[in-house]
Each structure stands twice: as C-alpha cells, then as structure tokens.
Amino acid sequence: MTEIDYKKVTGLVHSTESFGSVDGPGIRFIVFMQGCKMRCQYCHNPDTWAMETNNSKERTVEDVLNEALQYRHFWGKKGGITVSGGEALLQIEFVTALFTEAKKLGIHCTLDTCALPFRNKPEYLVVFDKLLEVTDLVLLDIKEINEKQHIIMTLSLIHI
C-alpha cells in the first residue's frame, strides 16, 4: 500500500483569514473552502457557494500550512487552524490531509461545518472517521430543526 503524501493533496480554497477570533478558541487561521450546496438566506459567505469560481484557487496542503505558520506566533496556547466555507466537508480529503499535517506540528484543528454532505453510510463513515481522528473541535452549524423552515431558510432538506 502506498502512503499518501498529504502535503501534496489539493483543495479549492476561496480565501484565508490570518487573525480570526470567532471560529474556534483563541486566535485562528481560517481557511474558507470553495463550494456549498445550501443557499442560506443569512449566509456570510455567499461568494463561496459555487463549486468553482475565478475567485478561488486550487492549493496544496503544504501551501496553505506554510501560509498559516506565518501567523502561528499570534495563536498562543489556545489558537490554531479552522477550516470553514462554503462547506468544508465537500472537500473532506483536503481537510483531512491539512489537519493530519497540522497535528504533526501540534496545531489545534477546528472544523466548521453544517454537515450537509454527511452520510450515515459505511463507505462515507470510514472517510469521516479519518477526519475526526485529526480534528480537535467540530463547530456544527445547525441551521433549523423545523423541516419546513429549514427549506425556506436554506433551500435544502434536513438530511441527518
């Protein structure tokens, strides 16, 4: 079996923020992934919805991690990296690779997700479990628990 070079895994990144203070504990480097299937009326990042756009860039884990490390001295003991979106789970392989490499450096890793791509199927759970093994905190963004209101607010069904 060939070992994966996680540093070379690529993802479509919309943008990054070097000094986030609301997406997890402490000061954080935020990676906003491109793509989301929900269309929330109150979305802060509607420019991340499209799966591809001229505003996003395909980047390697190594590239994103090197950018993040420039700001590590601001994180203190509580900060780290948060991956958000768009919807981070649409690019689960990239997020898993990024967190795997970050954990090797002792970096706290937070996943910000609405869990829309999540599926309770064995083949998905294997991939999802690999991500959870390298995730310190999940910020689960539950949009609405009433099915009718959820559709009105997000243009998508509740699926979990």
Question: Which residues does each PLM region occupy?
Answer:
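Radical SAM enzyme core and accessory elements
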Residues: 1-8
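Conserved Radical SAM active-site core
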Residues: 4, 27, 45-133
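Canonical Radical SAM [4Fe-4S] cluster-binding loop centered on the CxxxCxxC motif
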Residues: 9, 15-17, 21-59
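Short, basic/glycine-rich phosphate-binding loops at helix/coil junctions
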Residues: 43-48, 77-78, 138-146
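Conserved radical SAM core fold
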Residues: 88-89, 116-119, 138-154
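Conserved small/polar residues in nucleotide/adenosyl-binding loops
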Residues: 158-160
